[in-house]
Amino acid sequence: MDRRFFIKNTALLTLAGLGSGLSLSARAAAAPDEIRLDYAYYSPTSLVLKHFGWLEEQVKSSGIKVKWTLSQGSNRALEYLSANSIDFGSTAGLAAVLSRANGNPIKSVYVYSRPEWTALLVPKDSPIKTVADLKGKKIAATKGTDPYLFLLRTLKVNGLKKSDVEIVHLQHADGRAALESGRIDAWAGLDPHMASSELQAGSRLLYRNVAFNTYGFLNVTEDFAKKYPDQVKQVLQAYERARLWILANPREASQIQADEAKISLAVAKVQLNRTDFSNPYIGREHREALQAAAPILLQEDLVKKGTDLNKVINDLIDPSFVQTLAPKKSAA
């Protein structure tokens, strides 16, 4: 054999082998070592998914680990996303808009529920009968969450300003405790704490408005979505499995909610009965709902003056991933 021919072809084979190795390495690097998600008592879908381990099952063959972190509210989930402590976080839609407007690079990619998860509550024997009666009163709410924004919108439509009341900033569970101990006059509650307070302490719903409850959004960091689009799809596929299971098994879902959140089955049933799991396809409907709700963020100086909230909302909502779950459904 010609020596030059041998050397040339040996070199080509070596380069081909290196190229193959690099290709394999690149493919391996295209998947993360770990997917980090939150779970939340206000998101029954996350509890069912965590309970059955369906995401772990789905990514096991890829060698990807799954890590779960408890979120006590939208504000916590958004803090974790901003700090890169989690890749996926469960929040209310308007809370996600507020966070994105203030610089948190997230994308909302899935609707895990359409809940009536917040309302204004007062103690069972309270003399307060209307929202107007709240003037000069102490009201607990968790800043940066749907209940807080619900409170601001409720005050506005009832002719009150934020300065007309004293807002006490407490996490959801602490707000419930403060209401039941008489330290505050009213509370912008969140399920399941709200349902627990109704059933166990007799707390009374003072003001309800389903339209002021924004959707439950699953958010992902922009960085994760860009680097690992296939894993975003895998997470949504797992969420879909959990959502469909809840629709088919409401009693069992209530029991899982009760066990995970450490609440009574009766409370869990109340929470699930006022939660709509029918439409996960994020898109136009959700943009329009958020555009209608967003002005309160500017009116209350929660975002910088001049912020283009329509652009923020359009940049936030990304239907491209959920469309792959059901091509015949239009999410745009």
Annotate the PLM regions.
Residues 228-304:
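Secondary-structure end/capping motifs
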Residues 298-332:
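Conserved C-terminal helix/tail region of periplasmic/extracytoplasmic solute-binding proteins
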Residues 29-161, 166-169, 185-188, 205, ...:
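Short, glycine-/small- and polar/acidic-enriched structural segments
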Residues 24-28:
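Sec/Tat signal peptide C-region and signal peptidase I cleavage site
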Residues 59, 85, 90, 100, ...:
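Sec/Tat-exported extracytoplasmic proteins
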